[in-house]
Amino acid sequence: DTLAAPAPSIRAMALSFEFFPPKTDEQRQQLDRTVEKLKTFSPRFVSVTFGAGGSTLSYTPETIRHLREQHGLDAAPHLSCVGGTRAEIIDLLERYRAMGCTRLVALRGDLPSGMGSLGELRYAEDLVRLVRAEFGDAFHIEVGAYPEVHPQADDALADLRHFASKMAAGADSAITQYFYNADAYFRFVDAARAAGVTQPILPGIMPISNYTQLKRFSEGCGAEIPRWFGKRMAAFGDDVEGLRSYPADVVAELCRRLLAGGAPELHFYTLNLAKPT
C-alpha cells in the first residue's frame, strides 16, 4: 500500500527491503509470496536479520542462500558481534563470501539471554574494523543509524560521535532506525555531514500494519510515534477502512518528503509482509 500510493516517484527510486529468516514451512511460504510481490520493484538489495539475541542466527545463512539462488536477489546478512569470538565471526564471514555475498549489515546486536559477556568485539565499530582487516573491500558494509538517538546513548552528541566513528572505521553506508518525522532524518543527516560523514545515509521505513505492535516495537528501539498520529488513530475507533488506509497514507507522505529532500534510497522494514509495504 505504501509503495503503491506514490507510484511514479517511488518506482523510479532505489529501494531495498529487510526480511527476517523464517523458521517454519508456513513462514517460508509467506516469505516467498512476499518476495515475489516486492521484487517487482527491482530492489537494489535485501537484508536478512538474525533475530533478537541471535535467536534465529542459524536460519539466516539458509535464508540468504534461498533469496540469492531462488529469487536472484542481492541478499545481505545482518551480522552481530555481541557474544561471538573473532574466530567465529571470521568463519561466518567466510561462509557468506563463499555464497557470493558482497554486502552485509554490521551491528552490535543485543546480548543473548543468559550471556553475561559482550564477547571479544564490543561495538559495531569493532566489527567494521575486523571485516576490513580480514576481508579488505570484499564486502559493502552497512551500519545502523539513529535519527532520534539510540536508546542506550548518553545523549545525542555522544550518539553522533559513535556513529561518525563507525563510518570512519570503514562503513560504506548506513541504514537508519525507522521514524515518522522526516525532519528528524534531515537534522541527523545535516549533523552527520557536519561531523565529517560523507557516506550515504538510507532512511529506514516501517509500514504500519498493526498499530499496537508498532507501539511496542517503538518503545523498545527508541523510535518516536508522533502524538498527532496516535490521536488520529484513536479517533478512527472501529472504522476498519480508516485504520487501514490512513497509516499507509502517512507513510507514503513520509516517503515523498524524504525523496523530495534528497534521501538516496528507501529501505523498508517489511516484517515479511507485502501488503503494508
Where does each model-flagged region fall?
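Active-site beta-loop-alpha junctions enriched in small/polar residues
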Residues: 19-22, 49-53, 78-84, 109-111, ...
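Active-site mouth loops of central-metabolism enzymes
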Residues: 14-30, 75-87, 140-158, 235-249
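Conserved beta-strand positions in the central sheet of alpha/beta enzyme cores
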Residues: 47, 105-106, 175, 267
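Short, acidic/polar
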Residues: 25-38, 60, 86-94, 154-165, ...
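Active-site pocket-lining/capping segments in soluble small-molecule metabolic enzymes
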Residues: 26, 119-146, 195-248, 253-254
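Conserved N-terminal beta1-alpha1 strand-loop-helix module at the mouth
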Residues: 2-48
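Active-site-adjacent beta->alpha loops and helix N-cap segments on the catalytic face
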Residues: 27-28, 54-66, 85-91, 110-131, ...
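Conserved, mostly hydrophobic/aromatic
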Residues: 18, 46, 96, 166, ...
